[in-house]
């Protein structure tokens, strides 16, 4: 009996020691994504609007975009227009046919912002959260109908 018990124990040790473990997928995959940003993170919202051509008069509101600037201690939050949306003196929305609709931006809370060469920036540094209004700049009732787009990227202003 002792011999049989020793043989059985040895057999178990051999079986356990020689077994190969394998991974068997049986669930879902989780993904971890990390976005590394500048310290001053400026998030810019979206707006979609429809206006009749007859409404494209000076100061007519097109809409407001939400803007949140965090981690901007001492830095000036800024919005930069795409190269197709400005020239040396004007900011504009562009159509697929490259028609231009002049617009202007203004913070709705009355805070002081400055525009120059495609960049709309807060004149004081620090965090900010609020809305920026987009409105028609000048009488533009002669513009062709169609979809016009203004792309603004959040960032910060450096001197």
Curated annotation (Swiss-Prot):
Signal peptide region: 1-21
InterPro entries: Adhesin_Dr, Adhesin_Dr_signal_peptide, Adhesion_dom_sf, Dr_adhesin_sf
Main location: other
Compartments in which it is found: Fimbrium
Any one cellular-component term (Gene Ontology): pilus
Coiled coil location: none
One Pfam entry name: Dr_adhesin
Origin superkingdom: Bacteria
SUPFAM superfamilies in the record: Bacterial adhesins
Keywords annotated in UniProt: Fimbrium, Signal
Keyword rRNA-binding tagged: no
Functional summary from the UniProt entry: Hemagglutinins of uropathogenic E.coli mediate adherence to the upper urinary tract. These adhesins bind to the Dr blood group antigen and also agglutinate human erythrocytes in the presence of D-mannose (mannose-resistant hemagglutination (MRHA)). C1845 is a strain responsible for diarrheal disease.
Protein name in UniProt: F1845 fimbrial protein
Gene source species: Escherichia coli
Gene name of this polypeptide: daaE
